[in-house]
Swiss-Prot record:
HAMAP family for this protein: LpxA
CDD domains referenced in this protein's UniProt entry, alphabetically: LbH_UDP-GlcNAc_AT (cd03351)
Name listed for the protein in its UniProt record: Acyl-[acyl-carrier-protein]--UDP-N-acetylglucosamine O-acyltransferase
Single GO MF annotation: acyl-[acyl-carrier-protein]-UDP-N-acetylglucosamine O-acyltransferase activity
Gene Ontology BP annotations: lipid A biosynthetic process
GO cellular component, one term: cytoplasm
Protein family per UniProt: Belongs to the transferase hexapeptide repeat family. LpxA subfamily.
Species, as recorded: Polynucleobacter asymbioticus (strain DSM 18221 / CIP 109841 / QLW-P1DMWA-1)
PANTHER family: ACYL-[ACYL-CARRIER-PROTEIN]--UDP-N-ACETYLGLUCOSAMINE O-ACYLTRANSFERASE, ACYL-[ACYL-CARRIER-PROTEIN]--UDP-N-ACETYLGLUCOSAMINE O-ACYLTRANSFERASE, MITOCHONDRIAL-RELATED
Repeat found in the keyword field: yes
Length: 265
């Protein structure tokens, strides 16, 4: 049975699974869908065309599904889609998309989003990410699986953050972070491979060593960007006997090759 506090305001058109909990003074809009097992704390607002999956937890005073902070926005029915088992803490803001992009802001599964985080319009967040308190990402940013955002970090619009990358606290990021790389600084720069994080995720020592070598080729060997891409592609081919390592090297190569904003240097 849905447990809705008497002081909460839930629009009659909202679709809530039978076991959803809504705390005191929260507001749920007419175009909201919330899946089984999700809990909404007190004083939280969920509005817009927002679809939320199963077993999510929203703490107090979160603002979810509000209109994008984009001066071109004219009220188009854009969306926010949130997956399963996410934890979204106090005073977090997550906005719907814009028609200038795909029209969808998307949050995957199993993400840990701490207090005062801002996820802007059209952002695409993968699975198992961590957003530390006060991390802020601008519109159209992509955050891939297992990435970690340090507290009080800020990310420029259209930037991509690769799988298993880590952005240090209070950093300002204006270009892409390749997968597996640590970045930090008031103009974020590379600080090596996220070795401890990869070990915790079960990466083999051979794969970690290969990724450190790819990092060296890209950042330490004095090669041009184009020449570094060629050398890393050779490393992919040379690792064909170890498919896991070859796959991770290919991810590293393909990410930097696809960059339009450029990568951190």
């Amino acid at each position: 049975m849905t447990r809705i506090h008497a002081s909460a305001v839930v629009d009659s058109k909202a679709e809530l699974a039978s076991d959803v909990e809504v705390g005191p003074f929260s507001v749920i809009g007419p175009n909201v869908k919330i899946g089984s097992g999700t809990k909404v704390g007190s004083h939280t607002v969920i509005e817009g065309h927002t679809t939320i999956g199963k077993e999510n937890t929203f703490a107090h005073f979160a603002a979810i599904g509000g209109p994008p902070q984009d001066m071109k926005y004219r009220g188009e029915p854009t969306q926010l889609i949130i997956g399963d088992r996410n934890t979204i803490r106090e005073f977090t803001t997550i906005h719907t998309g814009t028609s200038q992009d795909l029209g969808i802001t998307r949050i995957g599964n199993d993400n840990w989003i701490m207090a005062y985080v801002h996820i802007a319009h059209d952002c695409q967040v993968g699975n198992h990410t961590i957003f530390s308190s006060n991390a802020q990402i601008a519109g159209h940013v992509q955050v891939e699986d297992w990435a970690i955002m340090g507290g009080m970090s800020g990310v420029h619009q259209f930037v991509r953050i690769g799988q298993h990358a880590m952005l240090g606290g209070a950093s300002a990021l204006v270009q892409d972070i390749p997968p597996f790389v640590i970045a930090a600084g008031d103009k974020a720069s590379p600080h090596g491979i996220n070795v401890e994080g990869l070990k915790r995720r079960g990466f083999s020592s051979e794969t970690v060593t290969a990724l450190r070598q790819a990092y060296k080729v890209l950042y330490k060997d004095g090669l041009s960007f184009e020449d570094a891409k060629v050398e890393i592609q050779k490393m992919v081919a040379a690792s064909s006997g170890d498919q896991a390592t070859a796959d991770k090297l290919a991810q590293f190569h393909d990410f930097i090759a696809a960059s339009t904003r450029g990568i951190i240097r």
